[in-house]
Amino acid sequence: MSLEQKINNLETDLHIMGTLVLDSLVGAVRALEDKDTLKASEVMDKDDEIDDAYMKIDQDWFELMATEQPVASDLRLSTSILQASLHLERLGDLSVYLGKTTPVSYTHLRA
């Protein structure tokens, strides 16, 4: 597989991960708004899938660095993909935290 194909695969994996995180965040916000504990549970269950996507990108990136030794724009692009995946993984974790707060009653708070 060529360097270009490996970088394209990283981009595709990042896109898939971004879609998972977006679905998770939207689900967490909706669960919180609707006080839907079932939806919150579904969001928390998706976290492992997001973590797996991050680990795949991380492993593929290190393999790319070791075998292809990209330079210039290829190096910048592949490193940006790795950093973006880290931030997406963190957003996935934050959606889990939102999901965990869904069952909490906020009746003691007043507007």
Where would I find each of the regions flagged by the language model?
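Hydrophobic/aromatic-rich structural module bridging two neighboring secondary-structure elements via a short loop
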Residues: 60-87
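A structural feature that tracks compact, well-ordered secondary-structure segments
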Residues: 28, 85-105
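Conserved small/polar residues in nucleotide/adenosyl-binding loops
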Residues: 107-111
